[in-house]
């Protein structure tokens, strides 16, 4: 309908030749030569790839993917009505520009996207390599915010973010800067992907939480559906209830919680500690592959500190703030959003 209207506006005559259906029906000389459902044909088309993947990844996950993808439906994205005006309304940036350090190390690759997000909402952004802290080019006491970026620091040869972690804790000058920053009451930090793994090692998110290898035993790059739940995370203020797509790209993103935490905190606190969850096509929290790309229990993909100021997430919201960065948005939401998606609200919340 949209295409036809656009063609008519431009004086182009068009004819509808047919419409898509749930079955492929091909006739020749009045006889059916093919009459099969899209699901069966898609499975036949993808079967060779699945057979190869069984030798390249965890075969249990691949079998699960075949089963779960066979009956896939269109997922529902949801943004509370009252947020549309906030997302689309020009964000008021005052003269005060808080300073944020975009922390990176050799092998990091997400600093440009992260810098753009914070620049877009009024921060004064600095690209800070760990070596800059050792040479006194910058000092963390200058900043109110830290963002640990994604990527593969030191190629993860020592384990995810371990090389980055050791470059901090094994240098007294650098280590003390991070300790002082964390202990201040006027600061916040945000870690994505490799940055999330680093925050776990530093203990900036609750101790006893580790990031382990994906159950699929391979790197996963997918467009996943997640839900934001109520928590004390300052960057998620007033965002609970949103269900939306987000990019994921990691090999070691499965959140594992120690028995001490499992037994030592209440169910409600445990729920608020992990404020973002993976969903399936029915918008239910899931551990099923590939909806949950790493197999984290109870769909967990983010974690926040007790005071709400330190927030870490495995997926990449910094790659999703613009509509043009999204591979797909339902038509009913696409029409309601202008330039930004709701993910911009995370960075606006940090500014506030």
What are these regions (language model features)?
Residues 1, 15-20, 29, 103-105, ...:
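Generic beta-strand/beta-sheet core signal
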Residues 2-99, 107:
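Intein/HINT protein-splicing elements and their conserved insertion hotspots or analogous self-processing inserts
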Residues 112-127:
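Short helix-loop-beta junction
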Residues 152-233:
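Cysteine-nucleophile active-site neighborhood
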């Amino acid at each position: 309908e949209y295409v036809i209207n656009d063609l008519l506006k431009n004086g182009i005559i068009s004819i509808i030749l047919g419409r898509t259906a749930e079955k492929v029906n091909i006739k020749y000389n009045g006889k059916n030569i093919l009459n099969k459902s899209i699901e069966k044909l898609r499975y036949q088309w993808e079967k060779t790839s699945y057979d190869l993947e069984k030798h390249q990844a965890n075969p249990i996950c691949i079998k699960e993917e075949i089963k779960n993808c066979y009956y896939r439906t269109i997922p529902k994205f949801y943004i509370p009505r009252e947020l549309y005006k906030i997302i689309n309304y020009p964000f008021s940036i005052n003269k005060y520009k808080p300073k944020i350090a975009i922390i990176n190390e050799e092998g990091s690759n997400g600093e440009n996207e992260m810098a753009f997000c914070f620049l877009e909402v009024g921060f004064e952004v600095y690209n800070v390599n760990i070596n800059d802290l050792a040479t006194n080019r910058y000092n963390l006491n200058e900043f109110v915010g830290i963002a640990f970026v994604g990527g593969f620091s030191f190629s993860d040869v020592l384990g995810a973010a371990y090389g980055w972690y050791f470059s901090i804790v094994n240098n007294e000058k650098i280590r003390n800067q991070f300790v002082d920053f964390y202990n201040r009451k006027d600061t916040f930090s945000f870690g994505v992907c490799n940055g999330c793994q680093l925050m776990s090692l530093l203990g900036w998110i609750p101790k006893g939480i580790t990031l382990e290898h994906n159950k699929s035993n391979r790197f996963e790059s997918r467009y996943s559906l997640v839900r934001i739940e109520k928590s004390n995370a300052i960057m998620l203020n007033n965002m609970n209830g949103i269900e939306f797509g987000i990019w994921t790209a990691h090999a070691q993103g499965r959140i594992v919680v120690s028995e001490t935490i499992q037994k030592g905190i209440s169910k409600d606190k445990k729920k608020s500690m992990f404020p973002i969850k993976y969903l399936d096509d029915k918008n239910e929290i899931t551990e099923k592959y590939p909806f949950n790309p790493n197999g984290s229990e109870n769909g967990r993909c983010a974690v926040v500190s007790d005071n709400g100021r330190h927030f870490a997430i495995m997926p990449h919201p910094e790659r999703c703030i613009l509509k043009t960065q999204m591979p797909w948005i339902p038509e009913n939401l696409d029409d309601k959003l202008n330039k930004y998606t709701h993910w911009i609200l995370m960075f606006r919340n940090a500014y506030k």
